[in-house]
Structure formats: C-alpha cells, structure tokens
C-alpha cells in the first residue's frame, strides 16, 4: 500500500491526510484537541455565524477559542451575504485563525433557510460573490466545504469546484451527498472522483468513513488527497489513529482496551467541565458519554444514570462506574480465555514431547488439569 502524500494548504503542510469535519455542537476546543491527539492532521471548529455583531456572546467566544491548539487553526464561517462573510473572515483572521473555511455543506434546515450552508449551491452567482469576497478579504488560506450539489438532478459540484479553484480557494472538502439527500443513502464517491479530476487543489473526501478498510476504499474510489471524518469520530476519536495506522502499514491496529476508552472519556469529560464550567459542561458532556457507550453492553443504563447527574463529580462517577464494570466483566473473560489458550498450548507441547507409548496418557492428564483449573459456572 502506498502511503498518502503530504497535503499542503497555503504555508501549512499537514501532519497527515486525515481531517476532523466541522460539526456544530460537537467540534468544540476540547474535542478538537482530543482528535488531534488521536491522529487527526487538521481539525475545523464549529461553524461561526458571519454576523460579527454576535461575536460578543459567550457561544461565539467559545467557538473562537483556540487556546493550546496546534497549527493550523481553522475557523469555519457560515452565511449568505458576501460582505458579512468577508467581515467575518477578517475578524477571525485578526483573532488568530490561520485558515478560513467557508460552509457550503451543512444541510440543516435552520441554516439552509437563511440561504447559507449547502443552500448556497442553488445560486452559483452568489457562490462566486461570496468566494471572491472572502478570498480578497484575508491573507490566510481559504478553503471550502461543500456537497455534490443541491439535489440529485442538480449536481453542480464540478462547476463550483472549478470556480473555487479559479478564485483562489486552496482546498476543498466534499461530502458525497446532495443537500436534498441529507445523510440518507450511500455517499457518491464517483461524484467526488469527478470533482477531484476537475481541479488541481487538494480534495478531502467526506461521508460514511467508518473504518480503516472503508478509508482505504474511499481513497481508491475517489482519488482524493485526504479524508474528512465527522459523525464516525463521535465517541470514537481514535478512529484517526486506526485509519492512519492502516494506511501506512496495511495492518489493523488493536482496538483500544476498555481501560483506555474509559481513560480517554474521563479526560474528555474533565476538559468539557473546565471549558464550559460545571453546569454547562455537564449538559454538553451527556451526548459524548452516550456516544462512548454506544453499542456497548447495558449502555441504556449508563444513559439513564448520566441524564440524572447534575454535577461534574456525580457524572464522572457514573461514567467511571459503568466502564469499570465493563472492564471487570470483560477483562475477566479475556483473562480466562488467555489462560485457556495457554493451557491448550502447554498440553500440546507435553503431548508432542511424549513418546508414542504414553502420549495418550499425557493428553488425558492435560484434560484433567484443564478441568480442575476451569472456574465453576
């Protein structure tokens, strides 16, 4: 397997070709820092409104916080007015943003109803005006996140990609669905491939990347330079580590142990409590705990307990108790399985060493020893 080539956006060469997708209500500073530690080469923050009059609010200030974040620091802005988008880009660049990302990919109704997000793809003239206004407003690189089109009958991703490159956009992230498709159906990797073939700037493929195998498949099918992971990093930030390991070694990295998952979650919760303050941090942390527990035994019990917790100490205790019980239960099972495998190997060695006359007796002895060692049910 050929290792992915480094991606360059303006003056920045990324550590790898894996990006965390911007997600409102998810990719706050604690989650971005966590995903970077877990192997993401770049992480975009939650989308910011282009209305700079709202930047004094606590919500906006938190979204503009990049304390301790490694380069390049990416801010995504959303809006439908070219001048407001230019003002927002300038404001964020002055505040330390090193890359400005334009949101034309969000399919949410509350965004599209304001003629922003992926709704912009319906109006190519407005798209051009916004791209030109933002690129001309700042000296930092500008990137664009978009979809394959407005609906299956209007896939204009290639047209907008070529327009963006000509205007000066330095990288594109393409979600493999139209706005009308939301997150339904399969991602259109063939459309992303067509977009990739139409431009020379770096392309990040986005959509349904949920495993190392899928990551490799998407790179092969799209020819993209990089991958952008969004929803599948929720409760599983180590997916970047797993994908990176597979792309470079063609081997599957071991899944994190329950102890490691517990420790990652615990540190994440503490960071959320510190970042938002206890009351808000406890509320924000609930969905993350739910994601960490997703697909695990008795996850519903954890959700119920967490929803009842109203302070950080109780929330941490509930989450710890749940994962500690999993470690105790499944850790013991693994230990017994390992002991059983060791017993079988020992028995096989004894049998092989015995001569023909007594081999049967030795095998029988191993069976007796194994039965004595097996815990009572």
Model-derived features: positions:
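Flavin-dependent oxidoreductase catalytic cores
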Residues: 1-377
């Amino acid at each position: 397997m050929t290792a992915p080539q480094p991606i360059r956006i303006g003056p920045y060469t990324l550590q790898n070709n894996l990006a965390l997708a911007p997600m409102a209500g998810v990719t706050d500073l604690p989650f971005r820092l966590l995903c970077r530690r877990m192997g993401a080469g770049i992480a975009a923050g939650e989308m910011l409104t282009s209305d700079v009059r709202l930047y004094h609010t606590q919500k906006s200030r938190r979204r503009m916080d990049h304390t301790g974040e490694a380069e390049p620091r990416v801010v995504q802005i959303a809006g439908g007015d070219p001048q407001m988008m230019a003002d927002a880009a300038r404001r964020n660049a002055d505040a330390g943003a090193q890359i400005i990302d334009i949101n034309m990919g969000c399919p949410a109704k509350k965004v599209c109803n304001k003629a922003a997000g992926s709704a912009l793809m319906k109006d190519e003239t407005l798209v051009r005006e916004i791209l030109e206004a933002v690129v001309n407003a700042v000296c930092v690189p500008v990137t664009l996140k978009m979809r394959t089109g407005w609906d299956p009958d209007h896939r204009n991703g290639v047209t907008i990609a070529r327009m963006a490159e000509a205007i000066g956009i330095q990288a594109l992230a393409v979600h493999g669905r139209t706005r009308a498709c939301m997150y339904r159906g399969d991602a259109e990797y063939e459309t992303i491939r067509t977009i990739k073939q139409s431009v020379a700037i770096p392309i990040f493929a986005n959509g349904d990347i949920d495993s190392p195998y899928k990551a490799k498949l998407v790179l092969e099918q799209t020819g993209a330079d990089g991958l952008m992971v969004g929803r599948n990093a929720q409760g599983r930030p180590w997916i970047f580590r797993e994908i990176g390991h597979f792309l470079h070694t063609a081997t599957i990295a071991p899944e994190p142990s329950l102890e490691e998952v517990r420790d990652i979650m615990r540190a994440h919760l503490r960071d959320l409590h510190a970042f938002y303050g206890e009351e808000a941090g406890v509320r924000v942390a609930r969905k993350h705990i739910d994601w960490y527990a997703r697909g695990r035994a008795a996850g519903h019990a954890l959700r119920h307990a967490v929803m009842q917790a109203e302070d950080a100490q109780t929330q941490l205790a509930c989450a710890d108790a749940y994962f500690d019980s999993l470690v105790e239960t499944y850790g013991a099972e693994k230990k017994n399985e390992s002991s059983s495998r060791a017993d079988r190997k020992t028995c096989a060695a004894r049998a092989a060493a015995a001569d023909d006359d007594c081999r049967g007796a030795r095998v029988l002895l191993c069976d007796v020893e194994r039965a004595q060692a097996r815990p009572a049910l």
